[in-house]
Amino acid sequence: MRVRADVVLIENGQVVLIERHRAEKHYYVFPGGGVDEGETPEQAAIREMEEETGLRVTIKRELAEIHFDLSVQHYFLVEKIGGEFGSGTGEEFTEADPDNPAQGIYIPTWMALAELPEHDNVYPAEVAKLAANSISAGWPKEPVLVVERMK
């Protein structure tokens, strides 16, 4: 089973996303990636955030757990404690090949929470909805569990 750890960082009414252009598709995802052997999902989330955005964060709490076929994705609400946005050093940047459409490009970006409902290309939609609703409703008391199956 593949385990991923992803982060939700909100500051000044904006959320950090990774803008992706891949194989002629344009979409946004939350920063994150695979959990390495011997690593907890929390440790992976912190590492991935720094690799992909250049920001150092601390975990506040788990927001969601998404089960999708043979993978589990953990989404954590985080708080920034340092770093420089856009200075990520992950292989997405150091080994990027803009001429390879299968690999695509990664662009760390900020998006206003109020704009999230206008975009149908922010994934996963369940986490985007949680972030957008946090403005008025706050965060759920317990992590949201989502189970999806391939159709």
Residue locations for each model-derived region?
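Conserved N-terminal beta-strand and adjoining loop/helix that marks the start
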Residues: 1-16, 37
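Active-site beta-strand termini and strand-to-loop segments that position acidic
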Residues: 9-12, 20, 78-80
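Short, well-ordered strand-loop elements centered on a beta-strand within folded domains, enriched
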Residues: 14-19, 85-87
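A conserved beta-turn-beta hairpin within the catalytic core of GNAT-like acetyltransferases
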Residues: 23-26
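A short gly/proline-enriched turn/hairpin at secondary-structure junctions
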Residues: 29-30
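Unchanged
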Residues: 35-58, 67-123, 149-151
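Charged phosphate-binding loop/patch that engages nucleotide di/tri-phosphates or the phosphate backbone
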Residues: 122-151
